[in-house]
C-alpha cells in the first residue's frame, strides 16, 4: 500500500543527496504533498508560489516521477498547486512577465518607472541553467519568491558575459509580475556614483536618498566600480543599512568577491557577506549547446544538432561570445544564401579561432610550468608543506593564476589542494609587494610570464 508521507520522506532524503543546502531550502523544504489518487495516480503537491510552481513543472517533475517509480514501481501524475494561507488555491497562471512589465512601464508615472531599464528578454523563462550557474539561479529564484527574507543581500559574482545581469533583472521582472506597484530600482554602479555627484552639485541629496532608500528591490550591477571611492562607499553603506533594516531586498553583481575588490571598506565587505555570495562560472559544453538551441529557437533559425555542437565546441569562454558566434554563422548564411550546416559554420568561424584564442591558460598548465622552473612538482605546489623552497613557488603560481586566467580566488584555491580563498589572496598580495623589492622574484615572474604567454 502506497504511503504518501513515507514516500515524501524518501523523496526528500534523495533530494538532499543531490542538491546543495541552498537549492534544497529554496525548492523542497516548504513543498508538501496534499493528496494521492490511487486510481488515477495523480499526486497533488503544494508549492509556495507561482515561481516555484513553474520551476517544479519545468525542472523537478521528472525527478519526482522517477523517484516514485523507484520507490513503489508506479508512474505517478504530479500536479502542482500554489498554496495560500488556507491551502492550495491560487491556481491561475500569472500574466506573462514581459507584458506585465511593459504595462508597468507605460502606466506608472513616478520616478521609479522613469529610471527602470529592465531588459524584457532577461526573465527566468529565458535563462538556461547548467552546472556553472544552477546554484546562482536557485538562489535568484528563492529571492524572487521571498524578497527581503531569503539571502539578503544576494551577491552574484563571476566573469564577463556569464548571465549575472540576466539573473538580477529576472528577479526584478518577477517582483513586478507579482506586485505591479512594487518600487524596483535597477542601476549600474556607475549610475549610482553619477547620481550622487549630481545630487551634491544640484543640492538634491534628499531626493537622491529618497529614490534609493525607499524602494522594495535594489539591483546594483558591477559593484566593483565602487573600488577606492570612499565617499560613494559611505553613501552606499547608509543606503544598504536603511534597506536591510526595512527588510527590503538588495541584489548585487560583481566580477569578483567583495574581499577581492580593491579598497572596499571592511564594513561593506562584512555586510555583503550577511546574505549569500554565489559564483557563476563559464558554461560547460552541454549548457553551451542548450544556450545555442534556445537562441536559435528564439530567432527562428533552423540549425541541426551537429552544427550546434560544432559552434558550442568553438567557444568556451562566455555566453556573450557564444551567441556572437551564432550571429556570425547566421550572417554568413544570409550573405552566401546557404543553409546553416557544419561546413558553413566552419567557414564562418575560421578566422576567429575562438577556442585557441580565448580559452587561455589552464591553472594546471601554470602549475606545471612553475614546478619545472623551480625544480619541484605540482603535487608539492598543491600540498601543505611550509618550507621556503615550496612556499614561494606556490605563491608565484597562485599569483600567475590570478593574473593570467579569469579564475576567481575560490577557484584558484580549489586547484591548489582546496585552499581557502584568503590564502590565495595573501599569496597574491605578497608576490605583488615582492615584485617591487625582490629582484630574484621579479626575474622569476618575468621569465614565467614569458614562457606561459608563448
From Swiss-Prot:
One of its GO terms (biological process) is regulation of DNA replication. It holds the Pfam family Bac_DnaA_C. GO terms for molecular function: ATP binding; ATP hydrolysis activity; DNA replication origin binding; lipid binding. Residues 74-116 are annotated as: Domain II. GO terms for cellular component: cytoplasm; plasma membrane. Residues 334-454 are annotated as: Domain IV, binds dsDNA. Oligomerizes as a right-handed, spiral filament on DNA at oriC. The lineage of its organism: Bacteria, Bacillati, Bacillota, Bacilli, Lactobacillales. Residues 1-74 are annotated as: Domain I, interacts with DnaA modulators. It comes from Lactobacillus johnsonii (strain CNCM I-12250 / La1 / NCC 533). Gene3D superfamilies: 1.10.1750.10, 1.10.8.60, 3.30.300.180, P-loop containing nucleotide triphosphate hydrolases. Plays an essential role in the initiation and regulation of chromosomal replication. ATP-DnaA binds to the origin of replication (oriC) to initiate formation of the DNA replication initiation complex once per cell cycle. Binds the DnaA box (a 9 base pair repeat at the origin) and separates the double-stranded (ds)DNA. Forms a right-handed helical filament on oriC DNA; dsDNA binds to the exterior of the filament while single-stranded (ss)DNA is stabiized in the filament's interior. Keywords: ATP-binding, Cytoplasm, DNA replication, DNA-binding, Lipid-binding, Nucleotide-binding. This is Chromosomal replication initiator protein DnaA. SUPFAM superfamilies: P-loop containing nucleoside triphosphate hydrolases (SSF52540), TrpR-like (SSF48295). ATP binds at residues 161, 163-165.
Amino acid at each position: 500500500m502506497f504511503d504518501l508521507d513515507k514516500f515524501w520522506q524518501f523523496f526528500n532524503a534523495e533530494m538532499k543527496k543531490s542538491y546543495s543546502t541552498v537549492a534544497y531550502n529554496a525548492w523542497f523544504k516548504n513543498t508538501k504533498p496534499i493528496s494521492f489518487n490511487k486510481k488515477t495516480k495523480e499526486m497533488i503537491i503544494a508549492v509556495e508560489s507561482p515561481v516555484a510552481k513553474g520551476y517544479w513543472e519545468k525542472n523537478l517533475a521528472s525527478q519526482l516521477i522517477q523517484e516514485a517509480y523507484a520507490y513503489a514501481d508506479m508512474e505517478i501524475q504530479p500536479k502542482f498547486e500554489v498554496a495560500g494561507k488556507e491551502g492550495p488555491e491560487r491556481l491561475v497562471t500569472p500574466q506573462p512577465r514581459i507584458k506585465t512589465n511593459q504595462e508597468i512601464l507605460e502606466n506608472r508615472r513616478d520616478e521609479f518607472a522613469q529610471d527602470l531599464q529592465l531588459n524584457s528578454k532577461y526573465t527566468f523563462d529565458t535563462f538556461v541553467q547548467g552546472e556553472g550557474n544552477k546554484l546562482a539561479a536557485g538562489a535568484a529564484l528563492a529571492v524572487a519568491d521571498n524578497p527581503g527574507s531569503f539571502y539578503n543581500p544576494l551577491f552574484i559574482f563571476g566573469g564577463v558575459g556569464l548571465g549575472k545581469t540576466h539573473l538580477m533583472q529576472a528577479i526584478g521582472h518577477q517582483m513586478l509580475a507579482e506586485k505591479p506597484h512594487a518600487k524596483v530600482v535597477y542601476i549600474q554602479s556607475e549610475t549610482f556614483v553619477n547620481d550622487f555627484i549630481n545630487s551634491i552639485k544640484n543640492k538634491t541629496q534628499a531626493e537622491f536618498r529618497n529614490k534609493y532608500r525607499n524602494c522594495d528591490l535594489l539591483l546594483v550591477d558591477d559593484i566593483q566600480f565602487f573600488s577606492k571611492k570612499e565617499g560613494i562607499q559611505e553613501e552606499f553603506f547608509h543606503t544598504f543599512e536603511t534597506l536591510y533594516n526595512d527588510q527590503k531586498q538588495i541584489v548585487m553583481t560583481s566580477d569578483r568577491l567583495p574581499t577581492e575588490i580593491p579598497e572596499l571598506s571592511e564594513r561593506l565587505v562584512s555586510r555583503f557577506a550577511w546574505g549569500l555570495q554565489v559564483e557563476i562560472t563559464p558554461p560547460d559544453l552541454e549548457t553551451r549547446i542548450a544556450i545555442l538551441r534556445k537562441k536559435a529557437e528564439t530567432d527562428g533559425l533552423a540549425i541541426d544538432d551537429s552544427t550546434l555542437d560544432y559552434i558550442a565546441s568553438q567557444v568556451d569562454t562566455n555566453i556573450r561570445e557564444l551567441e556572437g558566434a551564432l550571429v556570425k554563422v547566421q550572417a554568413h548564411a544570409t550573405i552566401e544564401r546557404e543553409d546553416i550546416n557544419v561546413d558553413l559554420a566552419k567557414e564562418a568561424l575560421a578566422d576567429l579561432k575562438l577556442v585557441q584564442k580565448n580559452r587561455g591558460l589552464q591553472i594546471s598548465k601554470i602549475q606545471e610550468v612553475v614546478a619545472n622552473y623551480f625544480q619541484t612538482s605540482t603535487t608539492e605546489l598543491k600540498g601543505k608543506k611550509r618550507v621556503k623552497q615550496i612556499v614561494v613557488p606556490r605563491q608565484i603560481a597562485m599569483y600567475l593564476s590570478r593574473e593570467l586566467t579569469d579564475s576567481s580566488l575560490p577557484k584558484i584555491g580549489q586547484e591548489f589542494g582546496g585552499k581557502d580563498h584568503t590564502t590565495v589572496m595573501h599569496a597574491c598580495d605578497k608576490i605583488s609587494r615582492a615584485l617591487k623589492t625582490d629582484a630574484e622574484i621579479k626575474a622569476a615572474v618575468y621569465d614565467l610570464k614569458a614562457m606561459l604567454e608563448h
